[in-house]
Regions:
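Conserved GNAT acetyl-CoA-binding A-motif
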Residues: 132-144
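Short glycine/proline-centered loop/turn elements that form peptide/ligand docking sites
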Residues: 125, 148-151, 170-174
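Short amphipathic helical patch at the helix-1/turn junction of helix-turn-helix
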Residues: 111, 145-146
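Acetyl-CoA-dependent GNAT
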Residues: 8-11, 22-32, 38-116, 122-127, ...
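Conserved N-terminal entry element of GNAT/NAT acetyltransferase domains
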Residues: 1-15, 179, 185-193
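Conserved catalytic-core motifs of GNAT/GCN5-like acyltransferases
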Residues: 141-144, 156, 161-178
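Hydrophobic "lid"/C-terminal helical patch
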Residues: 17, 21
């Protein structure tokens, strides 16, 4: 088991978050998204977006957490971004009130492949759940690519399941199917005195 921890992202993490996103997408999604789309993603553009997400979130419940691997040096190795569900979390044609208050949407949950299978994804998800619980959010949703077996397997192993919603993203005239997973945010465990 790796030595690691999760902490809130800092403004100076934005460039590293963008690098992790790009590296992970280029490995994990190479058979899902067109190669030229992955090759043309702009790391500087992504870094600016992550900087804004960290420094100017739309609400206090919008958060970016990072996973850190501790060795001789510390490395950022993954991240999770989430916030209250909005129109982006809806399926096509779904009414705007389909995801009621109290639902959080995970927009990104990535661990760089070379750091995978070391507990970072579980630590990120656990830390996020703790924050969702403290924000009073009772259900979580996440869109995953239909062809992303690793993410689906990870999330379903922790209790997530499809909620029946599906959509297809238009990525440079290629429709890429996604399905929405959901899970109840577990109540905080209380110990007996």
């Amino acid at each position: 088991m790796a030595l690691g921890y999760v902490r809130p992202a800092r403004p100076e993490d934005a460039g590293e978050i963008a690098r992790i996103q790009l590296a992970t997408w280029r490995v994990a999604y190479r058979r899902i998204l067109p190669r030229h789309v992955l090759d043309n993603l702009d790391e500087a553009f992504l870094a600016r977006r992550w900087s804004a997400a960290v420094q100017e979130p739309p609400s206090a419940a919008h958060r970016v957490l990072v996973a850190v691997e501790q060795a001789e040096q510390s490395y950022l190795v993954g991240f999770v971004a989430s916030g209250p569900a909005d129109a982006e979390a809806l399926a096509p044609g779904e009414p705007t009130d389909a995801l009621a208050d109290g639902v959080v949407a995970v927009t990104d949950l990535l661990v760089e492949p070379r750091w995978g299978r070391r507990g970072h994804g579980s630590r990120l998800l656990s830390a996020a759940v703790d924050q969702w619980r403290s924000d009073g959010l009772g259900r979580a949703v996440a869109w995953v690519f239909d062809g992303d077996e690793a993410t689906r397997k990870f999330l379903t192993s922790t209790g997530w399941e499809p909620d029946g919603a599906a959509r297809a993203l238009d990525v440079d005239d290629l429709l890429v199917p996604q399905l929405r997973l959901h899970v109840a945010v577990p109540a905080e465990e209380t110990g007996t005195p």
